[in-house]
Design a protein with these regions (language model features):
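Short recognition helix of helix-turn-helix/winged-helix DNA-binding domains
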Residues: 1-60
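Conserved aromatic-histidine-acidic binding/catalytic patches
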Residues: 27-31, 56, 70-74, 124, ...
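Winged helix-turn-helix DNA-binding recognition segment
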Residues: 48-105
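Short, low-complexity, polar/charged sequence segments that are solvent-exposed and flexible
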Residues: 59, 98, 113-114, 128-132
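Short, cationic-aromatic polyanion-contact patches
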Residues: 97-119
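Extended alpha-helical scaffolds
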Residues: 117-142
Length: 142
């Protein structure tokens, strides 16, 4: 985690828990299927809370892929596929060594700053979806 560069950080009042709740609400609308949402929530949950709010740090998941796969009830290959899909969706960046190793001290692993950078977009989507649901309830009298 490089401490000399500025990175996107969560706005005041936001926590990684709030980000997880937001993602759960909008997941289908950003192409995030339930199994991949579970992987993303797992990854987020294993980062330091302070890394989400400091512009001098990046939230990085550097846990071993094999161990994470076991905890998620997946094979390592399935988890690699999920990680690649999360990267294609612009939610993470994989920064690993040539052999795929991840190291916390070196800031190598699954980087979550792209997710933070898109937070405003996701909040706007959530607000739009809530407004649409409210409008539909008004139309149906519910």
């Amino acid at each position: 985690m490089n401490s000399t560069r500025n990175h996107p950080a969560l706005p005041d009042g936001w926590t990684k828990g709030a980000v997880m709740a937001l993602l759960s609400e909008i997941a289908p609308h950003i192409g995030l299927r339930p199994a991949r949402l579970a992987v993303l929530i797992y990854i987020i949950g294993r980062t330091r809370a302070s890394d989400w709010t400091s512009p001098n740090r990046e939230p990085v998941f550097f846990g071993a892929q094999d161990f994470a796969a076991v905890e998620l009830g997946k094979t390592a290959r399935q988890l690699r596929t999920d990680e690649a899909a999360l990267a294609r969706l612009g939610l993470i960046v994989k920064r690993v060594t040539a052999n795929g190793a991840r190291y916390g001290r070196a800031g190598l692993g699954l980087i979550l700053t792209p997710l933070i950078a898109r937070l405003e977009e996701f909040i706007a989507l959530r607000d739009r979806l809530r407004a649409e649901r409210k409008h539909l309830r008004a139309l149906t009298g519910r």
